[in-house]
């Protein structure tokens, strides 16, 4: 990263980058186990976000990697519970980032950073997406007309997609039908949101440009994660 006008801004892939992977960490012992490093011989570039379903199946995004003059694209992947095999849900998106499941687990949502789009995969079964169009298994739920980047996301109990939004500095809430609204925060680099509290209306939001983690009340309850602490 580098500093600009008091903000911390991430940069390109460093020369000593050793590759992307999914790790399992034992919180009691600190032991680290590498779970996945590739898909069919193709190395993971930068696994970014992940979510589990009720059966313990894992969905995760690979953001890809940026360099000064080019970019490695990323994808969306699946690992069945108890398996070490990585399956590809979809590939060749620009920059898949935040990922979440609808309350009924019938749809996987992910945010593509550079295009500022929320995509959806409607599932035939865990890890298998229906064909949305002749050209893609995914469908675009919403895309933004102005310059902004989408980062991590959380799903509300009502099924809305709450996406941390860079440059516009806030949380963009996208409904399943594509309608969207924006809640602003005083930092252009809002990068993550998570829900908690007894009623799941406490929102924890990262303001990465100024290095802050804030807590605020949210107008709707968040969807409780399967392995919620």
Question: What do these predicted regions represent?
Answer:
Residues 116-117, 121-125, 135-179:
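Loop/turn-rich, solvent-exposed surfaces of beta-rich toroidal or solenoidal domains
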Residues 13-20, 64-74, 113-115, 166-167, ...:
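Short, solvent-exposed loop/turn segments at conserved positions within beta-propeller repeat blades
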Residues 22-82:
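Hydrophobic alpha-helical segments and helix pairs
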Residues 120-131, 217-224:
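Short loop/turn segments immediately following beta-strands, especially the blade-tip
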Residues 20-23, 74-77, 117-119, 170-172, ...:
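A short loop-to-beta-strand structural motif that recurs across blades of beta-propeller domains
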Residues 1-15, 39-58, 75, 86-108, ...:
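Beta-rich, blade/repeat-based domains predominating
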Residues 33-37, 87-91, 130-142, 182-185, ...:
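Beta-propeller fold detector
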Residues 191-229:
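Blade-level signature of beta-propeller repeat domains, shared across WD40, Kelch, NHL, RCC1
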């Amino acid at each position: 990263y580098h500093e600009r006008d008091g903000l911390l801004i991430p940069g390109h892939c460093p020369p000593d980058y050793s590759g992307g992977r999914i790790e399992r960490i034992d919180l009691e012992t600190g032991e680290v186990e590498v779970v996945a490093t590739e898909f069919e011989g193709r190395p993971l570039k930068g696994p970014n976000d992940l979510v589990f379903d009720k059966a313990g199946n894992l969905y995760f995004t690979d953001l890809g990697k940026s360099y000064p003059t080019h970019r490695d694209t990323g994808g969306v992947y699946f690992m069945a519970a108890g398996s070490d095999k990585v399956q590809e849900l979809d590939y060749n998106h620009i920059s898949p980032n935040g990922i979440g499941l609808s309350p009924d687990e019938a749809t996987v949502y992910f945010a593509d950073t550079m295009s500022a789009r929320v995509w959806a995969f409607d599932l035939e079964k865990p890890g298998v997406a229906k064909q949305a169009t002749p050209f893609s298994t995914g469908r675009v739920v919403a895309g933004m007309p102005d310059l902004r980047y989408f980062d991590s996301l959380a799903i509300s109990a009502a099924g809305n997609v709450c996406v941390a939004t860079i440059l516009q500095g806030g949380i963009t809430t996208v409904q399943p039908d594509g309608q969207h609204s924006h809640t602003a925060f005083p930092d252009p680099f809002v990068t993550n949101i998570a829900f908690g509290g007894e009623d799941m209306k406490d929102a924890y939001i990262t303001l990465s440009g100024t290095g802050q983690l804030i807590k605020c009340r949210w107008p709707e309850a968040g969807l409780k994660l399967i392995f919620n602490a």
